[in-house]
Amino acid sequence: TSGYASVLTNFTYAGGDRWTVTIPAKPSCTKVDFCIALDSTGDPWIKDGGDHSVTFPSDQKVIYASMKAGSEPEIAMPYNVGYEVDAEKQQVSYYYRDDAAFVDGTLKDMTVAVDVNGTEYPMTYNDATKRFEYVKSGLTDGKTYYRYKANGAYVVDAFNSNSEKHNNADYSYFEYYKLNATVTAEVMNKSFNYNENNVVKFKVEQDSSDAKTLEVASASIDVSSLGGSNAMPIEPELQAVTISATTDTTLGIKTLPITVTDQYGNKFSTTVDVEITDRVKENKKDFDWDEAVVYFMMTDRFFDGNESNNTASGADTYGDNPGLYHGGDFAGVTAKLDYLQDLGVNTIWITPIVENIKGVAVTDEGSKDVPYNAAYHGYWASDFTKLNPTLGTTGEFETMISEAHKRGMRIMVDIVVNHAGYGTESTFADMLRDKSVSEGDIKSWQSGLPDFATENADVRAKLVEWQTAWMMDYGVDYFRVDTVKHVDSTTWAALKNSTTKVNSSFKMIGEYFGAGYASNGSSLGTGQMDADLDFDFNDQATSFVSGNISSVEKFLSARNSALNNTYMTGQFLSSHDEDGFKAALMNGKKYTEDEATSAALVAATLQLTAKGIPVIYYGEEVGLSGLNNYPYQTNRYDMDFSKATKDNVTYQHYKNLLSIRNAYTDVFARGSRTVVASSDEEGYDVVSRSYGG
């Protein structure tokens, strides 16, 4: 993501317990992803924890981050900005940092002053923030002109685009106006329990005598009394946010402070009251969000319950070929609900249900024997308002959901908001961004797929409307949200608000690629996702079965402490986009099949006894596994139910573990994790999980 090829870069010893490394990044870069290799080979399996990332504004030239073993990187000095207005204290803080001087170590030796409206004030170097600083009291309405005098030379603020001539010299400037407004707030439901969400919205009424029109620059709500952040962001464009409460939040009335900041730094405050009530389950089959056990299937590869729809997307799209439809459908899921219930799962994640592009086309990205454009997986939508006819009818979809609900099971539908399918440019012409413009993770066509301009309010509203309709009209329980990192936070907050208004118990788990409990692009705890898929977990499981027990236990302990029902991750071992756990051991680490099977059983034990939402990939429970070897993708195999026998050790292992988890769901969903005894050398790990004791 730095804009350069992935390379192994060595650290330089900096004395004491400090090591440093310099990573080049191209000007458009806003994020650097990396992992810490534990040896010089660069083997991706031999690393300290999972993937890590540092995110920063695009105007920054130098980022200084620090990281301790077992934790995530943190920005170690403030971003380079020229000034900050504190309207409450009626003062301005001026800052100066020469990035080149910082890099070569001469910054603190400079002499710097700030010239404000023609008067110079000496600035003092602050070693903690790595910059020169000066605080000036007093704010007046209108423009304030300023520039810096660095080692005798005048320079304008490189991080402020506002500059003009003032007294025949070049100056930067900012504007300030004291505005007057009243903020009020209201909550969707006066009361809710820990398994529900709620929507809070605010309204700003400005004094008509103000010289300028107020614009909301930022807003936040203090939900610390609900177990959350003391400054949870509220998207200014929405002026509404979804909130939730942790399971240990005490019952009763909670007062939530809201702060709104305008474009000049003026702050306005209000509060809203909510009541936390007791959670009463409807019956023995009812379960909480953090008690979900998910079974993820590629619907097309699971079971063919209605052969008449197999060629509904075109006669050439169905066949015995990894790039074609294989016949799995809604009717097939319904037919196997008893199998899934007997296994011990309570939530079924199915791949996207909407109509996808039809036909087959071999392109440069495909191969002659594996057609590329048969959209059996569901991620290439052509119409977000219709069901994919190859998966079944509206009636079959409704039957699948109702039959699952009769068994106390819930349906999680995979949705795509980021993009449409290949060749749909004319269909969505007024909703797409310019393909020729590529700006980071969000404003780019990923893999050539038509990318929605979700930052456009009209585009966002239409996409949210389409997705909300599925859960509102058919009783879908949860969404699995594709490509979270490629869509702006405002859109995710809007979708969360919309679904919460329809069903306060509705939840969303996001696919923020590379996310873990400590690094998720601020998609958790911010009114966006209720959970993210945990991309760190299978790396940790691989490390665990390789003998690194103590380091993995440290990771699991930290993860256990961080997670709660409002901030969850879903641990998986295999998926449709990654190598299967067992196959990866055989292919990458050269395990025999028996060795890989034994290791996979250990990994499954780790997964199903850990805090978080277990996500079982279809077929994994009977020993199936494959590689993400595009275009063949043997990890997208056809489910083989003949392997689900009493003699199948893997199958019985999963059933036994799930039976235990379901019997003590509060312990596994919310309990503490304590290591009783473990040894890397002797290869054992004894852990205590407890709750309420």
Task: Place the predicted regions along the sequence by residue.
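Exposed beta-strand face motif in extracellular beta-rich ectodomains
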Residues: T30-F34, G142-Y146, G252-L256
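Basic K/R-rich, polyanion-interacting modules in nucleoproteins and related proteins
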Residues: G70-T106, N168-L179, W289
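Short, solvent-exposed loop/linker segments at the N-terminal edge
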Residues: Y83-E88, K190-N197
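Active-site-proximal helices and loops of the catalytic beta/alpha 8
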Residues: G105-V112, E465-F572, G588, A596-T597, ...
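Substrate-binding/active-site clefts of carbohydrate-active enzymes
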Residues: F287-A292, D300-Y474, W492-Y512, Y517-N520, ...
